[in-house]
C-alpha cells in the first residue's frame, strides 16, 4: 500500500465505551480516529505507553484532564500528550467530535474493534 484515502462517513463506527463512538483508520506508522461523544460520556484516566497522542477538537466542547490539570477544549484547539502521560475526559453537553492521532499507531487501529478490521475495503478506496 502506498497511500489511500477514505471518507469518515464511509468507515464503520463502533461504540467503545458508553456514548463514546470511534471510527478508526491507520497507516503504516500513524493511527487516526474520529471520536464522537454524546453527553454524558466519561473516559477514565489512562495512558498510552507506546505512543504519543494528539487531540484536535472539531465540534462541541470537552473537558480534558491531563495529570492534575483540567481544562476545556473547544473547536480548533489541540492537545498533545507524550507517551505515559495520564489523561481522561468527559463531555459537557450535547455532542462533541474530535480527531485523535497516534504515533506510532496503536494495536486498536490495526485490528479495529469487535474483531473487525478498521482498514477500508481496498475496492472502496481511491488511491492518492
Place the predicted regions along the sequence by residue:
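Ligand-binding loop in jelly-roll beta-barrel domains
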Residues: 83-108
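Short, conserved beta-strand element in jelly-roll/cupin
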Residues: 37-38, 47-64
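Conserved short histidine dyad/triad with adjacent acidic residue
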Residues: 18, 33-48
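Structural motif
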Residues: 61-63, 70, 86, 95
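Short acidic-glycine-tyrosine-enriched beta hairpin
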Residues: 69-83
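A short, N-terminal "cap"/entry segment at the start of jelly-roll beta-barrel domains
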Residues: 1-31, 113-128
